[in-house]
Amino acid sequence: MAWDTEGLVGPEGADWRVPVQELENRRARLSVALSENGIESALIDDPVELYWLTGGRQNGIILIGGKDSDVQTTHWVKRSLERAKFESGGDDCPDPVIAQPRMADLANSIREIGGTEKPATLEGKIPHNRWKFISSKIKSLVGESKDCTSIMYGLREMKSNWEIDMLRESGRINKEMFESIKEKGGLGKTELEMAAVADNVSRKAGFGGRIRMRKWPMDCDRVVIVAGESASIPSYFDSAIGGVGASPISPLGSGHAKVKSNSPVTVDIVHLHRGYVSDCTRIFSAGTLSRVWMERLDHMAEIQKAVVSSLSQGDDCSKAWEIGSFMAKEMGYSDNLMGMNPDKSHFLGHSVGLELDETPVIANGFNRPLCIGGTMAIEPKVIYPDGCIGTEDTFVRTEDGMECLTMGNSFPLFTDWD
């Protein structure tokens, strides 16, 4: 081999691989879930789900056998096989990691490791053409291929202790990004100038450059800074804040507007630590804000506290939405909560993990609680023609209630640069 796996390290030579025990537990959970749903096996090839199951994001597929099946779980890799072996634990890999067969031989390869039925696929996530291609290669197997997307999403809602540690570290770095903006932002600075300052902190800490989302065709700017009127400009993105963005091909978030005196600047930052999302929002200004703006901020903090309390008690996410949106209505914010008509968003929080837009969501229709181990960013905001104000932190639900994984009270809701 012409290269050395010793180069596959994090900062200061740290081993950033997912622990093998994590991979074993995840595969075991999926294996049980497949059998509970009458599925012999599942063929997984989406990059995020592959990472969750294999610890890497190489070009390949993994076949997970159901607990009650005779299928040998196998990770097939097209490129790079040696890297995939290392990232899955090297000699301690939970299951075989071997070269991917020709797709024309996929059905026979499945038979060789104990499969007889068409495996389930991520029909609800992968591109339709990819699904059609895989389906054409497994048509000689018996039965009908089922969609295992909801099974995978459901399993990933409940984070392990290791994953929660990753989110907590993500939150720590997120706070450092805010501290850099506190230090170097201010009057006359452009939104993009300040975003670059935060980006620098994130990159030095190991951010890989991608924010992954489920909902097509969503992509996002992870350092959204909107000064004054910029916050009222809508975008394609399903969020309270739009923003001008850098150009028409990037019409979201930080743009070329400059900070003005006594006007709210909303800073909404996403950081990923080893893939895991933390999401926070705080308000800045160059000079004092009016009493009206500060009252609005206090109200958003009250709404966030009520939503967190509801989730902590085990209320359905739809109930938490009802509580928060009713409070906003009583406070007089119906026309401004999470945007202005006709560009409003209708949620108060979203689950996070390896993706920014995981489930459940604080919105109508999510008639189930956030599970123990579930992680969620809760972000009440109000938008007006002259600006936005609100707050956001990322939480995990534990047996004892909701725990903040990000800045919480350690960084003020409002910072005056002057």
Where are the predicted features?
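Active-site neighborhoods and metal-handling regions in enzymes and metal-associated proteins
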Residues: 1-418
